[in-house]
Amino acid sequence: MIKKYEVMYILDQDVKDTKELVSKLDAILAENGKILESNDLGLLDFTYEINHKKKGFYHVVIVEATTQAIKEFERIAKIDKNVVRTLVLNTENIQNYEQSVVLSKTDMTKYEEEQREKKNFRKPFIKREEAAVKESK
């Protein structure tokens, strides 16, 4: 049965030919399905070190594939030492899921702005006399 997935994988920063490895991994996903969207996010910093590395090449693929193709992708990704991490989401199971890397980036900026506003938020200081006047009204 073909389902919709969002697959993200991180490649080692020391990989010489990332395009070749990306095309190999994408071919595995497309073997029993089709790739709807493929986004290369480039070399990004990790939040914490993974295998003594501080950076990696991020790649996101939105694909319609069978579970067999996904399992085969995960198996090969575990074997290949150049693949640092993988994440596979079955987007059909997530309610109100919007599949777009561009949207994800804008959502993160909105989230960061909200957090900044919360961090800088202070209750306004109201003198007791003013508070008593407001309560009596």
Swiss-Prot record:
Keyword vocabulary terms for this entry: Ribonucleoprotein, Ribosomal protein, RNA-binding, rRNA-binding
Keyword Ribosomal protein found: yes
Molecular function GO terms recorded: small ribosomal subunit rRNA binding; structural constituent of ribosome
Gene Ontology CC, one term: cytoplasm
CDD domains in UniProt: bS6
Alphabetized SUPFAM superfamilies for the sequence: Ribosomal protein S6
Gene3D superfamilies the record matches: 3.30.70.60
Pfam families: Ribosomal_S6
GO BP: any one term: translation
Domain of life: Bacteria
Statement: the UniProt record of this protein carries the keyword DNA-binding: no
Family (UniProt): Belongs to the bacterial ribosomal protein bS6 family.
Functional summary from the UniProt entry: Binds together with bS18 to 16S ribosomal RNA.
Protein name: Small ribosomal subunit protein bS6
Organism: Mycoplasma mycoides subsp. mycoides SC (strain CCUG 32753 / NCTC 10114 / PG1)
This protein's encoding gene: rpsF
